[in-house]
């Protein structure tokens, strides 16, 4: 499922949806992703100052990937 992400809240919502689809609790995701429970709670709440490295770590753990398109590029 491709999602257009424009805000930290969009990332948080995506993380929550995918986590629930995988039947993971927040503490379980935190454990397998190697981050703290507070980080997952804040991430899902759309905290705008979440550390990008940890965000990428959580997304990778969930099996998500990020495609960044330069101006003028189109999704293939």
Curated annotation (Swiss-Prot):
<feature type="DNA-binding region" description="H-T-H motif">
    <location>
        <begin position="26"/>
        <end position="45"/>
    </location>
</feature>
<keyword id="KW-0238">DNA-binding</keyword>
<keyword id="KW-0804">Transcription</keyword>
<dbReference type="InterPro" id="IPR017507">
    <property type="entry name" value="Tscrpt_reg_HipB-like"/>
</dbReference>
<dbReference type="Pfam" id="PF01381">
    <property type="entry name" value="HTH_3"/>
</dbReference>
<keyword id="KW-0805">Transcription regulation</keyword>
<feature type="domain" description="HTH cro/C1-type">
    <location>
        <begin position="15"/>
        <end position="69"/>
    </location>
</feature>
<protein>
    <recommendedName>
        <fullName>Uncharacterized HTH-type transcriptional regulator y4mF</fullName>
    </recommendedName>
</protein>
<dbReference type="InterPro" id="IPR001387">
    <property type="entry name" value="Cro/C1-type_HTH"/>
</dbReference>
<keyword id="KW-0614">Plasmid</keyword>
<dbReference type="GO" id="GO:0003677">
    <property type="term" value="F:DNA binding"/>
</dbReference>
<dbReference type="InterPro" id="IPR010982">
    <property type="entry name" value="Lambda_DNA-bd_dom_sf"/>
</dbReference>
